[in-house]
Design a protein with these regions (language model features):
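Structural recognition of alpha->loop->beta junctions
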Residues: 112-126, 169-195
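A structural signal for isolated positions on well-ordered beta-strands in alpha/beta enzyme cores
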Residues: 93-95, 136, 154
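Short, acidic loop-to-helix structural element flanking the phosphoryl-transfer center
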Residues: 67-96, 104-107
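Substrate-recognition "cap/lid" segment bordering the active-site pocket of phosphatases
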Residues: 99-147
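Metal-dependent phosphoesterase signature
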Residues: 34, 45-80
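Acidic, Mg2+-coordinating phosphoryl-transfer loop and its flanking beta/alpha structural elements
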Residues: 138-182
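Active-site neighborhood of HAD-like aspartate-dependent phosphohydrolases
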Residues: 1-57
Length: 201
């Protein structure tokens, strides 16, 4: 009997357009005109230094605790994400794997998934994604592929990872384990350009 393919899919930056919500929330409170393309790295404390300078609160805390409702609950889904998610379910088991900083953020993630039509039955909140032994990991954070134990790494494009070279995220500890590494503009593009054309292994 053929083993079922398992897709591990991240939430933020893959299903949920958190970046857009963060930038809009920041601009609203700081009367600024920053764009998503200005977010040059994953660590928001370095991208939004004005927050700590003017409030004394680190940007990560400001976004993910003080303004978590605007950032997490009010975020829109990434374009085509739900259709792609449902499409992947026809090819294997899809689990949602995400690191959420606080218990409140985890609850907000579950509420958001349910509100936007995603299932909440197979959700795993996990900081260390090297513990995953799935066929695919689909993520926007290149660090989650370091020392990975997945067979196929799929990096979803974002302004903060556009300068990342694909093979730079693989090191000697996992180069023999990983079968393929690729990048796509979105989960929808991965589904339409790769999965539908027989790329699933």
């Amino acid at each position: 009997m053929e083993q079922e393919i398992i897709f591990a899919v991240d939430i933020d930056g893959v299903l949920r357009n958190t970046l857009k919500a963060m930038v809009e929330t920041y601009n609203k409170y700081f009367d600024d005109n920053k764009t998503c393309e200005d977010v040059f790295e994953f660590k928001c404390d370095n991208v939004f230094p004005r927050i700590e300078k003017e409030t004394g609160i680190k940007a990560s805390e400001w976004f993910f605790q003080l303004h978590s409702e605007e950032v997490f609950e009010d975020s829109l889904p990434c374009v085509g994400a739900l259709d792609a998610f449902k499409g992947l379910q026809k090819y294997g088991k899809v689990i949602i794997v995400s690191y959420q900083k606080t218990t409140k953020n985890k609850i907000q993630a579950l509420k958001w998934l349910e509100k936007n039509g995603f299932p909440t039955t197979d959700v795993c909140f996990l900081k260390d994604k090297t513990l995953l032994h799935t066929d695919y990991l689909i993520d926007d954070n290149d660090w989650n592929f370091k020392n990975t134990n997945v067979k196929h790494a799929v990096l979803i494009d974002a302004p903060y990872n556009k300068n990342i070279e694909l093979f730079d995220i693989i090191d000697s500890t996992n180069e023999d384990k990983i079968l393929s590494i690729s990048r796509y503009y979105s989960l929808f593009d991965f589904y339409t350009d790769y999965v539908l054309y027989g790329g699933v292994q």
